[in-house]
UniProtKB/Swiss-Prot annotation:
Lineage: Bacteria, Pseudomonadati, Pseudomonadota, Gammaproteobacteria, Enterobacterales
Chain segments annotated as transmembrane: 6-26, 350-370, 424-444, 458-478, 499-519
DNA damage recorded as keyword: no
Bilayer topology annotation: Multi-pass membrane protein
Protein name per its UniProtKB record: Membrane protein insertase YidC
Family: Belongs to the OXA1/ALB3/YidC family. Type 1 subfamily.
InterPro entries, per the entry: Membr_insert_YidC, Membr_insert_YidC_N, YidC/ALB3/OXA1/COX18, YidC/Oxa/ALB_C, YidC_ALB_C, YidC_periplasmic_sf
Organism: Salmonella typhimurium (strain LT2 / SGSC1412 / ATCC 700720)
GO biological process, any: protein transport
Amino acid sequence: MDSQRNLLVIALLFVSFMIWQAWEQDKNPQPQTQQTTQTTTTAAGSAADQGVPASGQGKMITVKTDVLDLTINTRGGDVEQALLPAYPKELGSNEPFQLLETTPQFIYQAQSGLTGRDGPDNPANGPRPLYNVEKEAFVLADGQNELQVPMTYTDAAGNTFTKTFVFKRGDYAVNVNYSVQNAGEKPLEVSTFGQLKQSVNLPPHRDTGSSNFALHTFRGAAYSTPDEKYEKYKFDTIADNENLNVSSKGGWVAMLQQYFATAWIPRNDGTNNFYTANLGNGIVAIGYKAQPVLVQPGQTGAMTSTLWVGPEIQDKMAAVAPHLDLTVDYGWLWFISQPLFKLLKWIHSFVGNWGFSIIIITFIVRGIMYPLTKAQYTSMAKMRMLQPKIQAMRERLGDDKQRQSQEMMALYKAEKVNPLGGCFPLIIQMPIFLALYYMLMGSIELRHAPFALWIHDLSAQDPYYILPILMGVTMFFIQKMSPTTVTDPMQQKIMTFMPVIFTVFFLWFPSGLVLYYIVSNLVTIIQQQLIYRGLEKRGLHSREKKKS
């Protein structure tokens, strides 16, 4: 095993990873079940099956804070539009990113209210409540840290239901407080609910290109319970009426996409039911229903929940609810990606540039992995030294493969050489590289983050393809500087074209990821020369490259 064959191993691992990404994107996995979780299939799959009504037309009111620009329908009090002023739709654009939307082309809403036997949102009790508001536009004024948007509804029996949205400066978490005044002579039984519904298919104006082979990130639903910290639930699974039905205390439900998320977090000590539903017309939902609460005659009951609507900022999400920060799509290597991101963020706090932070973390990671790299090159050098003996043995034994294998293993044992010693360090390093891939792909902090010169967005591909070409050049130099024992003509051709193949692959990768690989390759060249000098002193390497 030598350095050029390592390139082939890397290529195979890389292609395998891409195939796995495509498979993950296409398949419809069944949610894992645990003791307190059960998954059922519902035929109708409608929100009404869960006791949650469909929304209707009311008056639209607007709410503006320093970080949110929402439109709320007074019919039910659903959030039908959500703009994020701090995050432009595109680099250089003054148009804010739109997370929630209600148009003929696309539906994405955050619904909430009071259902249950006596809840005004129970379909059995008639249309959804038409709330009264004191004005049609609410604005968080300068110097104001909190904004409350109260909405009231009084039913035919004289019971008053108040739904109050509470916004805080700089916060994407919105508290939704409910007050129920029982004016009757019998207890009122009500349950809070929160539901997120969205069109499965993206229209052109919503498709950010994050589903291509290089930029695939998860878009779908998710939930969390004390037993299951973070479980994804694909939209296609919901559309197939294979629906979720989980009873749990605590937790949350969410809808995710690259960089942004919405989530409902129930705030109560009771049991909540988490569900998904196929609403028809290409729309799916995930939501929760809280355990019923009794409000006695003449009394006032209070309930609350929290809506997250905004970017996936890990530290802020973690402060809102346990494990909500796991919605950042770091894939199955999140336990490596999260510490790497914390390190990257710490470095950024000093240098102030995410591109330079990536360069520094690359040096740190490669420095930590240097002992593995050295062991890999040492093992390969020992294998090269044995090649003359192995070749002579093959000529002596001819086609006797069994004796060849036996004597080769005896030779390895006598020379204290592990034939897989060059592979193991490489395989151990791959999860770290993949974790960096997920980290750079899923971190909102890198969205529209500039580096230098022509790189104005580290989360987007290089518009001039300069970085991918530089990456290919560094691979070419690594290949030319590496000793080789490859004699097979086909393998030689593959090695020759490997830098070109990787360059083509990386044309569509985010600039931040390509920058990492360029710096990593440069570090490889430096480490390679240092290791070769040490091997020369031990007689395990010669500067004169063997001809094949």
